[in-house]
């Protein structure tokens, strides 16, 4: 069925994904982006509709094809987000803010607010987005990204990896506790925050790199987080999460409940 959910892929190895069929394009007026750099990047490369509004099937197909995300994990996290943030009548979800492109509101208790909706998919203490309390929980924050770079230089030798993730996750929680009187880190945010921390070094590193004691370079991190852009000639990773030492764990991907923040 055109636009329907594709079956689990037979091939789950690395392959070129920044290809001629998926060129990066700059945002057009009205295009929607949100707190998730992974989905933002997939939309800017045409794996998702470039306007940022998609069906759950399109999102699942995109993250499986573009990032080699575990199929069962992709189904779980996408429908989890769609049930709370999407329009179940039109079967459309905004990867950013509320928009009439998803159709008319159906009334309470439905939110239909898109992934920007606070304390559902999106949450406090993001690595590169400000807390909801401060007014913008979805736009790239250069100050926070500078801290991301600082911690990557200090603890990762210029790369973002598992070691950096632990230090930075603790720092962002401490910052939110100290500055945000409405700080909320209850479920599901407790789980998505730590999944968010692991996604960049698992899926934003070229899949042809079989030994990766370094992790995600700052040049490529800037492309994904700020520009929603894959590096030139980028190959997706092997199926499953990549650990700090470069060993693939095919059973870990279902635990990734977010595509990075």
Curated annotation (Swiss-Prot):
Top-level taxon of origin: Eukaryota
Could you confirm whether the keyword DNA-binding appears in this record?
Answer: no
Q: Which UniProt key words apply to this protein? A: Glycoprotein, Heme, Hydrogen peroxide, Iron, Metal-binding, Oxidoreductase, Peroxidase
| InterPro entries xrefs | Chloroperoxidase, Chloroperoxidase-like_sf
Cofactor or coenzyme needed: heme b
**UniProt GO molecular function:** heme binding; metal ion binding; peroxidase activity
Q: Detail which positions bind heme.
A: 36
Q: Which residues are glycosylated?
A: 100, 137, 141, 220
- Provide the pH dependence: Optimum pH is 5.0 with ABTS as substrate. Optimum pH is 6.0 with dimethoxyphenol as substrate. Optimum pH is 8.0 with benzyl alcohol as substrate, and there is another optimum at pH 4.5. Optimum pH is 6.0 with naphthalene as substrate. Optimum pH is 7.0 with pyridine as substrate. Optimum pH is 7.5 with veratryl alcohol as substrate, and there is another optimum at pH 4.5.
Name one process (GO BP) from the record. Answer: hydrogen peroxide catabolic process
One Pfam family name from the record? Peroxidase_2
Q: How is it modified after translation?
A: N-glycosylated.
Keyword field contains Iron = yes
| Cofactor binding remark | Binds 1 heme b (iron(II)-protoporphyrin IX) group.
Which protein family is it in?
Belongs to the chloroperoxidase family.
* Record function comment: Aromatic peroxidase that oxidizes aryl alcohols into the corresponding aldehydes and then into the corresponding benzoic acids. Catalyzes the regioselective peroxide-dependent hydroxylation of naphthalene to 1-naphthol and to a far lesser extent 2-naphthol via a naphthalene 1,2-oxide intermediate. Halogenates phenol to 2-bromophenol and 4-bromophenol. Oxidizes the sulfur-containing heterocycle dibenzothiophene to yield sulfoxidation products, and trace amounts of ring-hydroxylation products.
Q: What is this protein called?
A: Aromatic peroxygenase
